[in-house]
Amino acid sequence: MQIGLFSNGNRNNALAKTSYDEDLHEIILADRLGISEAWISEHGTFLAYQRPDQLPSADLFICKAATLTKQIRMGPGIRPLPFFHPLQIATDCAVCDHLTDGRYMAGFGVGINAQSNKQRGTLVHDPRTMFREAVDLILKAWEAPEPFDWNGAVWQGEKWHIIPKPMTKMEVGIACSRSDTTLELTAEKGFLPLMSWTPTVAQVREMLSIYMSSEHKRGAVPARSRARVGRVVYVCDSVAEAKRDLRDAELAHAYNRMQHVIPPGGSNADLTFEKLIDRGFFICGDPDTVYDGIKNIYDEVGGFGTLLLIYGKDWGTLEQRCRSMERFMAEVAPRLAALNPDKPRVASAAE
């Protein structure tokens, strides 16, 4: 198992620079500790999620972070394609590929509630139709040796091209919802499936099953190692200490994101911190408890390649969050490294 970071920025600082500096501090630390990749949240197209310190342009942040780090790969998590012209996205990605010396990963998605978002006007096409065509057009712009004509359902043009072309063959991550079509497209194109921390363990298992089946259909050897799964992870001395540091901040965020966990007829009062720990959304406590929690989820879903630690939040203090990352990489990650989701499973005698 590899370890990555999902910098899911949500600190509610009055000054954006304060949050950006803290996010940079975490990325720099992650790079020093050997964390392999970081996906940087891009929030700027959905009115209900607006905060004074949100990051509406992850690419700019990534280019600055690249000058302060050595090995970590970074990508936006994600660019909502229906709100941009695909050639602009293709160009932005190519430039970032050059500016990061090939450490840039493209991150695409439909966007949260794209159809009802009026901040940039009403979309004239179905957002998923726009997303699919945008992906095809971006790939064409990256790969076409000569200017090309495009006559799609959404975009049309003649002699299109981008300058510069990408320097490398970038990895592309797709924000995967529980939609079959998104997971199937991800497998069809050979992209990386990015799974947020909000799906239940059962939903992650189902999403991985759809992805693996779709990989098989396109004739590829299905590889669970390409799947990225996010979870809130916090390492300290005890579960009690973790609850004290995490409870207020994370419950406030969870109320807006975890409605699917509330039982029929229930309310936010059912989203207790203890229940969210029991359901595997928050994995916290001493190193052994954290390892066991991650291993249990890994086994329940059938394995995955990269665990994305959720950062960019306002729980505890910056020092506590950094200490958690340091302890995780020193005391938990080495034990997880032995997990290989693509290794054939050997059935026990009891089975």
Task: Mark where each language-model region is.
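N-terminal small/glycine-rich loop or linker at the start of catalytic domains
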Residues: 1-15, 71, 113-116, 155-168, ...
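N-terminal beta1-alpha1-beta2 module of alpha/beta enzyme domains
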Residues: 1-68, 72-73, 168-170, 346-351
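Flexible, glycine-rich active-site loops centered on histidine and acidic residues
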Residues: 2-16, 82-149, 192-193, 199-201
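Conserved, mostly hydrophobic/aromatic
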Residues: 3, 42, 65, 96, ...
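Hydrophobic faces of well-ordered beta-strands that scaffold small-molecule active sites
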Residues: 3-7, 38-40, 74-76, 104-108, ...
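Active-site mouth loops of central-metabolism enzymes
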Residues: 7-21, 79-87, 168-178, 279-285
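Glycine-rich, proline-tolerant flexible connector loops at the mouths of alpha/beta enzymes
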Residues: 37-61, 80, 112, 199, ...
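An alpha-helical appendage that flanks or caps ligand/catalytic pockets
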Residues: 125-161, 202-305, 337-351
